[in-house]
């Protein structure tokens, strides 16, 4: 049996080439080489050059060990056996399966594989690939196509303005014929056709196709917001939202209209703008004259006027005109409160309610009434307050004709006319017509007093009680 060396099973780099690989690719190289070594030893093949094996096991740079003089070839990652150096029957298949398994498992973006080769120059695991003139191709010049039997690489190149293609017999992905440069992208794409959603949220049961989107979704339940803006301190759940936000501070407008040259900081804004050039007219609501650029948004808006409420709660039968509103409503029944105040530990069902609550601790009241100078922490409360000065009561009860300044007051009033008490206390089974009354009632069972007076440190269960108390100090 001929003695094998690591020159015969060679993956070779210069120091400069090694530095071009990212850590994942370096780790893949080490793992493949060591597994090759172990497989050969297990088959009784004598292996020379133990220094390289030791170097790999200690995770040192492989170019520190002199395997042999580096041959003059383009900078690439090459792994090969020659036809003459297969000492044991079946080891060739074993080698191919090993590399293919490693490749498919790790899904490294810019490593490409060819199978079924018989000579030294035919079988390569490489970056980008070579053409038939042994010229190195960039990864953008290669496409991984899905064949029914195996994964193959087609390397396309140009020479003297002639287009040539290697490795015939390839088959595109049969579902749609789409091809990909990256094996991981192909794997992800196939999920679309399969309709598969393997990632299911244990909290709400929602399923996702991609692990990345699933992980971002889980942060809704945990309240985690790992992305913080250094400019303004805003925090975000997803990296995509954070990236969009940063453009506000930089003034960057990366999305440019090819028709007129106008630039935008968001792709969605560019899409809306393009409708002007396409001759698409904005949609105007005949009821309130509000203008919409999206037909889907207009369809949602029309439900306000028609009273259509297609999203119904299975627990209590209450219906809503938006799916997001139904999702928020369901938390009443589940008791879920994913948004927690870091100051006092109070939890909320909606992030907007948490943001409003935070102003209790900061004392911030940015919204001021021009009529009386009174300030408010929420713009909505200011708008409702203004109706005191105007005397406006736009919300009228259809049952008795009584009018109200706020729609919430009318909604609460309408429950007088019905015997329905949908809000039930889990502690004592007492039921209430209004959710606010249930919230007040629940404080009987707890000692929670979140509203604290800054002047005397006295605490109260209700914010209204704190306001009454403050008058003592003034």
Curated annotation (Swiss-Prot):
<dbReference type="GO" id="GO:0008270">
    <property type="term" value="F:zinc ion binding"/>
</dbReference>
<feature type="zinc finger region" description="C2H2-type 4">
    <location>
        <begin position="255"/>
        <end position="277"/>
    </location>
</feature>
<dbReference type="GO" id="GO:0009653">
    <property type="term" value="P:anatomical structure morphogenesis"/>
</dbReference>
<dbReference type="Pfam" id="PF13912">
    <property type="entry name" value="zf-C2H2_6"/>
</dbReference>
<keyword id="KW-0238">DNA-binding</keyword>
<keyword id="KW-0678">Repressor</keyword>
<keyword id="KW-0862">Zinc</keyword>
<comment type="function">
    <text>May be involved in transcriptional regulation as a repressor. Plays a role in limb development.</text>
</comment>
<dbReference type="GO" id="GO:0000978">
    <property type="term" value="F:RNA polymerase II cis-regulatory region sequence-specific DNA binding"/>
</dbReference>
<feature type="zinc finger region" description="C2H2-type 8">
    <location>
        <begin position="367"/>
        <end position="389"/>
    </location>
</feature>
<dbReference type="GO" id="GO:0006355">
    <property type="term" value="P:regulation of DNA-templated transcription"/>
</dbReference>
<keyword id="KW-0863">Zinc-finger</keyword>
<feature type="zinc finger region" description="C2H2-type 2">
    <location>
        <begin position="199"/>
        <end position="221"/>
    </location>
</feature>
<comment type="similarity">
    <text>Belongs to the krueppel C2H2-type zinc-finger protein family.</text>
</comment>
<keyword id="KW-0539">Nucleus</keyword>
<keyword id="KW-0217">Developmental protein</keyword>
<feature type="zinc finger region" description="C2H2-type 3">
    <location>
        <begin position="227"/>
        <end position="249"/>
    </location>
</feature>
<dbReference type="Pfam" id="PF00096">
    <property type="entry name" value="zf-C2H2"/>
</dbReference>
<dbReference type="Pfam" id="PF01352">
    <property type="entry name" value="KRAB"/>
</dbReference>
<feature type="zinc finger region" description="C2H2-type 1; atypical">
    <location>
        <begin position="171"/>
        <end position="193"/>
    </location>
</feature>
<keyword id="KW-0479">Metal-binding</keyword>
<dbReference type="GO" id="GO:0000122">
    <property type="term" value="P:negative regulation of transcription by RNA polymerase II"/>
</dbReference>
<feature type="zinc finger region" description="C2H2-type 10">
    <location>
        <begin position="423"/>
        <end position="445"/>
    </location>
</feature>
<keyword id="KW-0804">Transcription</keyword>
<dbReference type="InterPro" id="IPR001909">
    <property type="entry name" value="KRAB"/>
</dbReference>
<dbReference type="InterPro" id="IPR036236">
    <property type="entry name" value="Znf_C2H2_sf"/>
</dbReference>
<feature type="zinc finger region" description="C2H2-type 5">
    <location>
        <begin position="283"/>
        <end position="305"/>
    </location>
</feature>
<dbReference type="GO" id="GO:0005634">
    <property type="term" value="C:nucleus"/>
</dbReference>
<feature type="zinc finger region" description="C2H2-type 11">
    <location>
        <begin position="451"/>
        <end position="473"/>
    </location>
</feature>
<dbReference type="InterPro" id="IPR036051">
    <property type="entry name" value="KRAB_dom_sf"/>
</dbReference>
<feature type="zinc finger region" description="C2H2-type 7">
    <location>
        <begin position="339"/>
        <end position="361"/>
    </location>
</feature>
<dbReference type="GO" id="GO:0006366">
    <property type="term" value="P:transcription by RNA polymerase II"/>
</dbReference>
<keyword id="KW-0677">Repeat</keyword>
<protein>
    <recommendedName>
        <fullName>Zinc finger protein 141</fullName>
    </recommendedName>
</protein>
<dbReference type="GO" id="GO:0035108">
    <property type="term" value="P:limb morphogenesis"/>
</dbReference>
<keyword id="KW-0805">Transcription regulation</keyword>
<feature type="zinc finger region" description="C2H2-type 6">
    <location>
        <begin position="311"/>
        <end position="333"/>
    </location>
</feature>
<dbReference type="GO" id="GO:0000981">
    <property type="term" value="F:DNA-binding transcription factor activity, RNA polymerase II-specific"/>
</dbReference>
<feature type="zinc finger region" description="C2H2-type 9">
    <location>
        <begin position="395"/>
        <end position="417"/>
    </location>
</feature>
<dbReference type="InterPro" id="IPR013087">
    <property type="entry name" value="Znf_C2H2_type"/>
</dbReference>
<keyword id="KW-0225">Disease variant</keyword>
<feature type="domain" description="KRAB">
    <location>
        <begin position="4"/>
        <end position="75"/>
    </location>
</feature>
């Amino acid at each position: 049996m001929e003695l094998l060396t690591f020159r015969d099973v060679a993956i070779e780099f210069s120091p400069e080439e090694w530095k071009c690989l990212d850590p994942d690719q370096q780790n893949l190289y080490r793992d493949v080489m060591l597994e090759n070594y172990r497989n050969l030893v297990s088959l009784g093949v004598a292996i020379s050059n133990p220094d390289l094996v030791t170097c790999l096991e200690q995770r040192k740079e492989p170019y520190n060990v002199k395997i042999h003089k580096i041959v003059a070839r383009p900078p690439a990652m090459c792994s090969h056996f020659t036809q003459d150096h297969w000492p044991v029957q079946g080891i060739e298949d074993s080698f191919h399966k090993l590399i293919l398994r490693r490749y498919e498992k790790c899904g490294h973006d810019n490593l490409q594989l060819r199978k079924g080769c018989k000579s030294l120059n035919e079988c390569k695991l490489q970056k980008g690939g070579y053409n038939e003139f042994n010229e190195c191709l960039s990864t953008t010049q290669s496409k991984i196509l899905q064949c029914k039997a195996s994964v193959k690489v087609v390397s396309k190149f140009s020479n003297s303005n002639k287009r040539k293609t290697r490795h015939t017999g390839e088959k595109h992905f049969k579902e749609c014929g789409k091809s990909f440069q990256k094996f991981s992208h192909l794997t992800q794409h196939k999920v679309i056709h399969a309709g598969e959603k393997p990632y299911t949220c244990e909290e709400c049961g929602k399923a996702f196709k991609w692990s990345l989107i699933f992980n971002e979704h889980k942060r809704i339940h945990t309240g985690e917001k790992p992305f913080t803006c250094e400019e303004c301190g805003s925090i975000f759940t997803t990296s995509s939202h954070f990236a969009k936000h940063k453009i506000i501070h930089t003034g960057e407008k990366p999305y440019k209209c090819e028709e007129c040259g106008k630039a935008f900081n968001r792709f969605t804004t560019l899409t809306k703008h393009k409708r002007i050039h396409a001759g698409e007219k904005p949609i105007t609501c005949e009821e309130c004259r509000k203008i919409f650029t999206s037909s889907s948004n207009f369809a949602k808006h029309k439900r306000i006027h028609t009273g259509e409420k297609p999203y119904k709660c299975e627990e209590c039968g209450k219906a809503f005109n938006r799916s997001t509103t139904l999702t928020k409503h369901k938390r009443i029944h589940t008791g879920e409160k994913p948004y927690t105040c870091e100051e006092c530990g109070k939890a909320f069902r909606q992030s907007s309610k948490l943001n409003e609550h935070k102003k209790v601790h900061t004392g911030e009241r940015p919204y001021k009434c021009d009529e009386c100078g009174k300030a408010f922490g929420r713009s909505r409360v200011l708008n409702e307050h203004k109706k005191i000065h105007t005397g406006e009561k736009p919300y009228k009860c259809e049952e008795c004709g009584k009018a109200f300044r706020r729609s919430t007051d009318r909604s609460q009033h309408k429950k007088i006319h019905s015997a329905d008490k949908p809000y039930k206390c889990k502690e004592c089974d007492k039921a209430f017509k209004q959710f606010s009354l249930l919230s007040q009632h629940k404080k009987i069972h707890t000692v929670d007093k979140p509203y604290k007076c800054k002047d005397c440190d006295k605490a109260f269960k209700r914010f209204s009680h704190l306001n009454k108390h403050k008058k003592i100090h003034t």
